[in-house]
Amino acid sequence: MHSRLLVAAPHCLLLLLLLPSALPALKVGGLYPRDVMDPEVQEAAAFAVENYNAQSTNDNYFKARRIVEAQSQVVSGVKYYLKMELAKTTCKKIAGKPKLYQEIQNCNLPPENQQEEITCHFEVWSRPWLQKTVLTKDEL
């Protein structure tokens, strides 16, 4: 039994020494790319679009055309960094009756020669244990 341990010990030591170089370098608090189709990214994008429309002074809703890029960072919760393309819809805002994301996504676009698209950079901070999500940044 002892001879097996003595033979295995150098191999285990070698494995432990090589393992860190085989793993990608992860930085605590660093930004990491995310799949734009990830459900958490999709949820953050929906939150960003709803809040963008609530804060926008435009008379019409803007809907998500696509998520161009998504990253996340662990910071007392998760902060999502999203680059999104939005398009102005034909749906008019009605005071006191905001539309939810899925309703906005169902809105039609104007004819192609009248379409207006914008690229936005959003930061969405999610802290699920507090049941709190905040749009911390929206820039055109």
UniProtKB/Swiss-Prot annotation:
Pfam families: Cystatin. Residues 1-26 form the signal peptide. GO terms for cellular component: extracellular exosome. Keywords: Disulfide bond, Protease inhibitor, Secreted, Signal, Thiol protease inhibitor. It comes from the Eukaryota. A motif (Secondary area of contact) lies at residues 73-77. Expressed by the venom gland. Residues 29-129 form the Cystatin domain. GO terms for molecular function: cysteine-type endopeptidase inhibitor activity. InterPro entries: Cystatin_dom, Cystatin_sf, Prot_inh_cystat_CS. Belongs to the cystatin family. This is Bitiscystatin. It comes from Bitis gabonica (Gaboon adder). The lineage of its organism: Eukaryota, Metazoa, Chordata, Craniata, Vertebrata.
